[in-house]
């Protein structure tokens, strides 16, 4: 449909009028026999004339509808499809599902023809697939994988009217076992399930919440909680609060503020406490027994076995695009089996060991003409890296280590 407009006249550089007047005065003062000069600085006036403006014919304009995102990795989105993924018979005879089963079921989702299996919505599993794969690929952690799987099944079946209020969690385990990594995955899962409005993780050490004077701790704690709305608040190093026999005024402010917000802001954020199980009980829950009941889930990460330590070392080597000497794999495995107790911080210690091993390797091959052996770690590299690792950890005697197995 057309709409008519009055002709629009627009003048650009209206200051040309004043320039014209000035130039005219100057020309009058010129001598009669002098050639008239042309003012090259004068800008021309430009006029735009629009007779009418025409709108697009909206009645004939095609509208584009964006289809919803489908998370099915084998889905063709066809309501008449003949290639719907087949659910294996094994699932009909199962009485208990594990993490592998949930991942497999998520891969069988079809947005038109296969949306549910029994009481489980397959689309939600399809959405969670990448996060579940990430969790499943972690080395060890069998106990926590089983616990998270049970939690997921409960929430997937929508049996809880207010699931956001039930997600406060305790993750216990020694340093270096991967608590932070598990927290990241949990936050990712809760976000994809719609329980969080953002994936933000706010990690706070409890001693950072204790103020410099009485009345200062509560605002610090409240600020940390407010910054976690829509995401996850992680409270680490709970032993900083103090033991059950002694609770100062600063620590009491922190605990009371946390407890109050778990009620007043229920469902608006998830609180996760990380640390040793004994420390969490004695230094946190012992001060306020009401707190314990607010944390419905308690996940434990066990210490790593020697074989798992080797797998962690091997994985870190591969992630850095290095290699282990294939001819010495068994000897390297034995090294971790006989020195497992020398890595009390597990993953952290393995990372440090790998760094010193790389340094030892570079010094060993510095004059080596065979570039094909570069970045291939052998037992000697690990032995020398381990010696440096132990020295940095203030170990005084190599006799404490089982180097006889090197």
Swiss-Prot record:
It comes from the Viruses. ATP binds at residues 173-180. Pfam families: AAA. InterPro entries: ATPase_AAA_core (IPR003959), CbxX/CfxQ (IPR000641), CbxX/CfxQ_RuBisCO_ESX (IPR050773), P-loop_NTPase (IPR027417). Residues 13-32 have a biased composition (Low complexity). GO terms for molecular function: ATP binding; ATP hydrolysis activity. Gene3D superfamilies: 1.10.8.60, P-loop containing nucleotide triphosphate hydrolases (3.40.50.300). Keywords: ATP-binding, Nucleotide-binding. Residues 1-37 are annotated as: Disordered. PANTHER family: AAA-TYPE ATPASE FAMILY PROTEIN / ANKYRIN REPEAT FAMILY PROTEIN, AAA-TYPE ATPASE FAMILY PROTEIN _ ANKYRIN REPEAT FAMILY PROTEIN. Belongs to the CbxX/CfxQ family. This is Putative cfxQ-like protein R730. It comes from Acanthamoeba polyphaga mimivirus. The lineage of its organism: Viruses, Varidnaviria, Bamfordvirae, Nucleocytoviricota, Megaviricetes.
